[in-house]
Amino acid sequence: MRDFLAANPDRIDDAVWECLRRFPLVSSSREVRHDMEWEGVHLKAGDMVMAPTAASALDPAIGGEPMTIDIDRKRPQHSVFGKGTHTCPGAYIARIELRTMLREWLARIPDFRLASGTTIEHASGIVGTVKPFDLVWDA
C-alpha cells in the first residue's frame, strides 16, 4: 500500500478513512441514567458503559472482509468520531492532519519499511494506540 499511496496521493483520503474504520482511536462511554437491566445485565444509575467503536467497524454488513484494509471499499458510515450530537468537534481537523502527515511523509520518505523482525501491534481500549515499532529507510 505504501508504494500505491506514494504514486497515488489522491487516494490518501480513502486510506485514512479505511484505517480509521479498521483501527478506531477511541471508544464512546455513557453514564447510565437510571437502574435498568439490558440483555440480562443489571446496570445501576451512575454506572459507566463503553461502546467499543472497533466492534461496529467489524460488522460484515459493511461489505467485503471487515478485518482487511481495503481502500476501494465503499466508505461505510463508521462511528470512530461519534455520531449526531455526539460527533467529535475535532473530527474534520483530525482527518486533515492525518491526510497531510501521510501525504508529506510519503513525499519525503517514500521508501520506508519495517525494520527486520519488527511487527506492528494495535492495542485497543478506551483509547486505541499502536505499540512502538521501528522503521528504516535509505538516506
Where do the model's predicted regions map?
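Cytochrome P450
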Residues: 1-139
